[in-house]
Amino acid sequence: MITGRTALYGVLGNPVRHSRSPQMQAAAFEHLGLDATYVALPVEPERLPAAVAGAHALGFQGLNVTVPHKRAVVALCEAVDPVAREVGAVNTLRRTERGWEGFNTDAAACLMLLREEGLRPGAPALLAGAGGAARAAAWALVRAGAVLRIAARRQDAAERLAAELGPLAGPGTPAPVAVPWGALEAEADAAEAVVNGTTVGLHPEDAPLPLRVRAGQLVADFVYGDTPLARAARDAGARLVSGERILVRQGALSFALWTGRAAPEALMAAAIAAPGRAT
């Protein structure tokens, strides 16, 4: 039961009703005996400043931020963590007295999972997209030492992202390069790792990305659910970092930032996989 003592958390996005974050975070709160609740908050882009300010005024303790607000919310933060500043996007807000502190747990989660799946320094990698999620993925790939090529429907966005992340490339590692969207298939064929940072797969009617996946390739998809890319990766025998794994890991990192407690990650993963949960 929600009372005047219940700590409030939520996720801002548009669309956001499909989000599995509420049941995942609710399971973690319940497991640790915390009096807290987490809700999905649909917010259209033009209402984002009012929503962020209103959530602070209403006493929310923390927020996640999802499509399409991850870049726009940066300007609404009182302070921004160095990683989020490098990424140029924020997906987690933590309350301070004066406002919100912004973090990017997408980026940290992606880096951890890519390393766990054996992404080697110097590996050629292809990223599809240049929006908020793609920025987190690009940061993770560069920090992991991959030789990154970025393809986006808007070539200027891919070029801008490549230029911004270039200074982060390690000694001896080539800076990221933007490539045409039309070269996606050929670039994927040459890559050891392929990451989808677009929203392709979010809607059932979405056409798949125009690329092939092969056995042993490392494939990561920021969209969760039975996406075309996830199916292709499983069918081909690729190493898959699914959207669910990214969701759970970033959610666990957000939980720790908000509460100062280690998140029950296995339980959170089980919560989003349970029958009857939102998809």
Swiss-Prot record:
GO biological process: amino acid biosynthetic process; aromatic amino acid family biosynthetic process; chorismate biosynthetic process; shikimate metabolic process
Enzyme Commission number(s): 1.1.1.25
One of the record's GO molecular function terms: shikimate 3-dehydrogenase (NADP+) activity
Signal peptide: none
Pathway(s) served: Metabolic intermediate biosynthesis; chorismate biosynthesis; chorismate from D-erythrose 4-phosphate and phosphoenolpyruvate: step 4/7
Active site: 70 (proton acceptor)
Reactions performed catalytically: shikimate + NADP(+) = 3-dehydroshikimate + NADPH + H(+)
Pfam families: SDH_C (PF18317), Shikimate_dh_N (PF08501)
Keywords in alphabetical order: Amino-acid biosynthesis, Aromatic amino acid biosynthesis, NADP, Oxidoreductase
Residues where shikimate binds: 19-21, 66, 91, 106, 224
Annotated NADP(+) binding sites: 129-133, 222, 243
InterPro entries tied to this protein: Aminoacid_DH-like_N_sf, NAD(P)-bd_dom_sf, SDH_C, Shikimate_DH-bd_N, Shikimate_DH_fam
Keyword flag ATP-binding: no
Domain of life: Bacteria
Subunit-structure text: Homodimer.
PANTHER family: BIFUNCTIONAL 3-DEHYDROQUINATE DEHYDRATASE_SHIKIMATE DEHYDROGENASE, CHLOROPLASTIC, SHIKIMATE DEHYDROGENASE
Role summary: Involved in the biosynthesis of the chorismate, which leads to the biosynthesis of aromatic amino acids. Catalyzes the reversible NADPH linked reduction of 3-dehydroshikimate (DHSA) to yield shikimate (SA).
Family statement: Belongs to the shikimate dehydrogenase family.
Protein name per UniProt: Shikimate dehydrogenase (NADP(+))
Record gene name: aroE
